[in-house]
């Protein structure tokens, strides 16, 4: 198993989109009270006194939608300024990027992943649960702005949902031909969206690869990331195609990450909900960071067992209690 040096940090569980796979329609969401969110000071304390001493050097800011977090640019600046920070990135829906991308880049954010599940305005709005004025154009402009200010690599995250956007696989893959963009197809997961998942199921990565292969051919890329994606290229293309196959092709041996929710729960495995520890409450109760560090060290020691043996028994009820937006997936 890879060294665990990567922490995904959810800044907020709220979002200005309501994507079906992340915040399912009809599911009642109990949003975290602002007073229960980790404050900037608490988060920086945990990073500096708990995670960095244990070897964490790569940090990704997620949500919900992280750009809704008040003061997010200053938080980026503070994390980027830590001498041990080797990599600081963000996952966003892109809607606010057209006015925030430059400031984020100048603050020290160098890599960005943007969710883009459709190039069709109507389909895009359907997936994100938007019934008012379309949000497609502003999102697309945000992607363009992020690339123009210098984010490299710029990655686009795509979840293919049967019967909704599976007809766009070729169009989305084609974005990598003339642009140095990296499109990543992520298999749809049954976390907090059991009804939609049961209704729609998922498209295996190999089926997506085969669709692309039949159109243009597909070769393994010499560009490799530091995560679970299998990386390919369309011959002659400038960008890459990544496939994250958490449903069809177990990659637990390559896992190098943990997740910290916006309210301070540390989750060692995305699929395991029972092995989490509550760092925020302990911190607010005055537990020393040295003790918290030892608790995290213990979780690190058993993470391989959680990944390999407890991956499929990650809930006590058989149903995940939190949605992707609440976990910071």
From Swiss-Prot:
Its EC number is 4.1.99.22. S-adenosyl-L-methionine binds at residues 21, 64, 115, 189. GO terms for biological process: Mo-molybdopterin cofactor biosynthetic process. It catalyses: GTP + AH2 + S-adenosyl-L-methionine = (8S)-3',8-cyclo-7,8-dihydroguanosine 5'-triphosphate + 5'-deoxyadenosine + L-methionine + A + H(+). Keywords: 4Fe-4S, GTP-binding, Iron, Iron-sulfur, Lyase, Metal-binding, Molybdenum cofactor biosynthesis, Nucleotide-binding, S-adenosyl-L-methionine. [4Fe-4S] cluster 2 binds at residues 252, 255, 269. [4Fe-4S] cluster 1 binds at residues 15, 19, 22. PANTHER family: MOLYBDENUM COFACTOR BIOSYNTHESIS PROTEIN 1, MOLYBDOPTERIN COFACTOR SYNTHESIS PROTEIN A. This is GTP 3',8-cyclase. It comes from Rippkaea orientalis (strain PCC 8801 / RF-1).
